[in-house]
């Protein structure tokens, strides 16, 4: 169940994020670095590394809510705070992809034998 951090950022649990993604209600933005994203990612997540992040470059009036994710929740919270500083709604996924995997949710990895992406359980 979602909750709000002390600085008013909405925080979703991984299972909620998975459901909202499946329903097309959110845009999941992964703020990890490209090498982290290449190693494993959540299906449907878009990459926008925090190291080059500019919250003003994200859509402000799209039909889907933007939810940020990272490895453990710190960088995604930073991105959400930056977006909120612009007066835009923002949310992040608690625990990042680490928590996502701990809950057994699937990630996409590259099969080293074929070079193709494969979805595997977390």
Could you say what each language-model-derived stretch is?
Residues 1-27, 34-65, 74-122:
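Rhodanese-like catalytic fold shared by cysteine-dependent sulfurtransferases
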Residues 69:
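Short, surface-exposed ligand- or partner-binding patches at beta-edge/loop junctions that are enriched
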């Amino acid at each position: 169940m979602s909750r709000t951090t002390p600085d008013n950022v909405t925080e979703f649990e991984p299972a909620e994020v998975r459901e909202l993604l499946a329903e097309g209600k959110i845009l999941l933005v992964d703020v990890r670095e490209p090498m982290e994203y290449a190693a494993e990612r959540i299906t449907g997540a878009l990459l926008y590394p925090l190291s080059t992040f500019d919250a003003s470059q994200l859509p402000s009036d799209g039909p889907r809510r933007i939810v940020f994710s990272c490895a453990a929740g710190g960088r995604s919270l930073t991105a959400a705070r930056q977006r909120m500083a612009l007066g835009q709604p923002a949310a992040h996924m608690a625990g990042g992809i680490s928590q996502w995997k701990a809950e057994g949710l699937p990630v996409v990895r590259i099969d080293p034998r074929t070079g193709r992406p494969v979805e595997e359980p977390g």
